[in-house]
């Protein structure tokens, strides 16, 4: 059963969240953190799979996404920046933990949500997580990020809340280049044409992000790649990196392996990685999604 939750944002307005409730007493909590230009109900199939296994699942629409687009109507913008959006995710975690204090707690972040999850690991090492799953992540060349952030900062001086097609093209424009005979500009998401078509058709998906959000995301990525922040993580926390071998965000497994390697260099004691050949960005929505679901389940259950 899925229910809606609302709470005050640390930025502005109200945050919408969903809770998927299993039958009987839950055995653990899984908190999902979604990606850019999407919303939590897209994870309904995965969440329902987890509830059938006895998990309580929670997830919030980030500011400017899903039903958390408030009265100002601004989509794809974080009022207060990256760390304010992180605080909204942390508030859901705190509220859920307060209600279910004895349950193991697993964090799952996808795409932009993977960068948010990694921020939480670096910034809040004592938040009481049992395990973390980092899905569809990447690693950016650290030397290039400050220059890129400076360029975007200049654009933001005009109006950081407005959608910016040019910046969006800089960040995402090359993602389809390795897809043979693409039908749409979003074929890089999944080999499942129905998933891609539903994404394109939905008004809450695939919109152009603001310059401010793209800047904030780059600042977040820069934060999670700094050595001192990586070393701040809870060294005993189990972490599972999963991604598609044909995911351009990775890119194509390389950045995922680099991220896992940097976690190990930072002293993380239990780091696993699984790259799914031929899978694109949204492995939870791929044609072999059931395989991914089962792998995630089996990995989580090792730590319960």
Q: What are the residue ranges of the model-derived segments?
A:
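Active-site glycine-rich loops that stabilize anionic/oxyanionic intermediates
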Residues: 34-38, 111, 245-246
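Alpha/beta-hydrolase-fold enzymes
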Residues: 117-204
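Short beta-strand/loop motif that positions the catalytic acidic residue
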Residues: 241-243
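Alpha/beta-hydrolase fold nucleophile elbow
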Residues: 100-111
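Alpha/beta-hydrolase active-site loop
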Residues: 78-97
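Catalytic active-site module of serine/aspartate enzymes centered on a nucleophile-bearing elbow/loop
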Residues: 266, 270-304
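N-terminal cap/lid segment of alpha/beta-hydrolase-fold proteins
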Residues: 1-24
